[in-house]
Amino acid sequence: MKILLNLCLQKTNFSFYNYSNPKPETRNLQIMDTTDKKLLALLQQDTKKTTKELSVKLNLSVTAVYERIKKLEREGIIDKYVALLNRTKIDKSFVVFCHIKLIQHTKEFLTTFEHQVVKLEEVLECFHVSGDYDYILKICVKDMEAYREFMVTKLTTLQHIGSTHSTFMIGEVKNTTAFTL
């Protein structure tokens, strides 16, 4: 029986994955095949493509594409679908990277700052980092005057900020949301 099972496995190219002890960072990569990766590349370029259009590009049935997308959503590989806006068209073309240093590194200060900063609509991204500063914020506003207003009335009113250092974008060299798989 064991020999027959091994022959069947070799003929069909099945491979088994040990789900009892997966490494979290590699588990999702192992459940994706080449077609999944191609599908994700296409979706990262344009999520408005229909399953029919995707099926033609991938040489799959519409149902197969639909099922693959649902699987990738269930697995959390596809996190969400969004519309990417043109900053210039919505008067948010002034981009600032603001480095924040807190007065202390206690859990209370970090947590308080994080709870407060996520409420600021001008802050698009916030990263807790190592090095000379504790956080880097990506802020998009209309212009320098709007940034000054933001700094004076919102950012510097947050608790536990020791210092800030702002860097302004001169030009955009690369800006992508697409991962290479």
Please provide the spans of the model-predicted regions:
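A compositional/biophysical signature of low hydrophobicity enriched in polar/charged and small residues
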Residues: 2-181
